[in-house]
Structures are given as C-alpha cells and as structure tokens.
Amino acid sequence: FNPENRRRMQGLGEKEDTTLSSGKSLPFVVTISREYGSGGHHIGELLAQRLGVKFYDRELITLTAQQSGLGECTVQENEQTVNGRLLYDDPVQTAVFRAQSRVILDIAGRESCVIVGRLANFILKGRPRCLHVFVYADEAARLKRIISEYGIENNRAEALLKRTDQERREHCLHYAGCDWGDRYYYHLMLDSSMATDEQVAEAIYSVIHCLAAE
C-alpha cells in the first residue's frame, strides 16, 4: 500500500458527508462492489432498469480510454488490478486509475446512475446521495454461476474465482488503503445466494425508494 494513494483518494471527492438524503440537487448514484461470480453486474443492470437510469460497468473502459489517451486494451488490462504487492505505483495502472476516477466523478456529477466496481464507492466516499452496496455469495453459488453463466471450465473456475477476488482486494488496498470487503465502507451488503438476482435488485430498489420518501 502506497500511503500517497489514500491522500489522493481523499482529495478526489467532496467534503465528508455520509448523509444519504442531503444534497438534494445532486444526482443519486448507486455503486455496486461485488465478489466475482456473485452476480453484481446483472443485479446492477436490473437495478438500473428498475430506476430508469444509466448503467456503467464495462462502458467505463471506453470512457477511461478516451480520458487517458490509452487504448481500451491497455485500460482493460490495468484496471482493478495491481502488479503484485508493489510499494510504489505502476505508472500505467496509476494513469488508468486516475483517469477512471475523473470519469466516475464526472458521471456522478451530471446524472443519476448505477456504477459497478472500479472503487467507485471510495472515489465517491462522503458524497451525498450515494448508496454504496456490496454483493457477495457463498463459494458454491459463485462457482455454479461462473461455470453455467460465464462459460468457465470446471477445472479453472475455483482458481479464477480466488484470483479475481484477490486482484480486487489488492487493488482496493493499494489505491484506497482499505479492506475491499469491510462493511464500514458500504451502506448495504447483500448475499445474492439467498435470492434471485431480480429479488436482490428489488431489495436495493426498496431501500432507495424508502430513502427518497424521507
């Protein structure tokens, strides 16, 4: 972990204000962090459809490439990961992270939306009118989804699951200085193995609906 990254992260967003209902003029943004294979992408899509707002996941790769001047392949290879346990930043990965942070801040400033991954909850930490969600599931359910829905071979699924989660965890630690799955950094954490994706999305929608009524 590079301590300088935490200082930079703290300077990205607005002043600390964890009140969800404050800042009424701001767009409402939902960030979804997720364990690999938990269905966070699909749940985010369903939620965005239910809310009638834009959904951002892989689209952020294109937008980050445009912001940074790097190719989309370079962005895809260097986002949400770090090269081992580095004490110092990889210049390309840092350029990608900074460009992606600017993209996320710009999106959050102009439209209500659902954003999946990319440390959006940390980039928007303290910003009013954000709901930060973490989606997880038991390993058996995640492996089943990875194999049946993502088309990953059985003998590769477990290793891919562990590697992807570890990459996300190390990326979060390196750039935010925080534990990726720590409940302190989320308003809502949901076990997707306990319900269908549609039910999980509806549960998040219900929370947002209650907040809007306050």
Features from the language model and the residues they span:
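Short, amphipathic alpha-helical "lid/cap" segments that border enzyme active or binding sites
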Residues: 101, 197-205
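Pre-Walker A (Motif I) flank of P-loop NTPase domains
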Residues: 25-30, 111
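Glycine-rich phosphate-binding P-loop
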Residues: 30-47
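Conserved phosphate-donor/acceptor-positioning beta-strand/loop module used by diverse small-molecule
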Residues: 126-149, 154-164
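Extreme N-terminal, non-catalytic leader segments
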Residues: 1-27
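Small-molecule kinase domains that catalyze NTP-dependent phosphoryl transfer to phosphate-bearing small molecules
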Residues: 153-198
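ATP-dependent small-molecule kinase phosphotransfer cores
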Residues: 59, 64-112
